[in-house]
Amino acid sequence: MPFVPKKQAFNAHINEVVLGVGDKATAIGGQNVLPFHTFDAEIKNAPKIGVELTDLGMAEYTMPGEKAFYEGCTTVPEMAKRAESLEGASFICLHLEGADPNGLNKSVEECVQLAKDVSDATTLPLVIMGCKNIEKDTELFNKIAEALAGKNILVLSARDENYKTCLLYTSP
């Protein structure tokens, strides 16, 4: 007896969002099926692959392959430029873990400048990931969204406490 798959009902719609600007802009979402359920219906935009970079630089990369790939890079923007050459990379995710008040407690201004420098160094869309401290992330996200207005960045880790103020700068 042949196998006949039963289609899953998914009554919601995942909105399509365009990250970045220019030739390397990439769209995510846009389907009305459960994630990865291509057997139920066509998925408009295939899943994308991002390269995560930390603001802590090369000190955090301990795997031999990572060290070899980023060899010669001395700054995070240089690493972003190198990551752009990875086959299949659709976006850069900048993780600002050095901003954590319980860690290095980098200043908001320093993180904003780094985000600008990374954005200038690469043509790939930029995703910003905070330090997981609600108060610091609120300030970080607002300042970075303001500084990179018009670049269609994605702010990860936004919570109910802080996402609405970021929308002021990211909406067209």
Residue ranges and their predicted role:
Residues 54-56, 97-99, 129-133, 158-160:
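Active-site beta-loop-alpha junctions enriched in small/polar residues
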Residues 83, 144:
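Conserved, mostly hydrophobic/aromatic
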Residues 4-54:
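N-terminal basic/disordered segments at the start of proteins
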Residues 51-77, 104-105:
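Active-site mouth loops of central-metabolism enzymes
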Residues 46-50, 90-93, 125-127, 152-154:
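Structural preference for beta-strand elements that scaffold enzyme active sites
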Residues 90-112, 132:
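Glycine-rich, proline-tolerant flexible connector loops at the mouths of alpha/beta enzymes
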Residues 106-126, 148:
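Alpha-helix-loop-beta-strand connector modules within alpha/beta enzyme cores
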Residues 169-172:
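Conserved small/polar residues in nucleotide/adenosyl-binding loops
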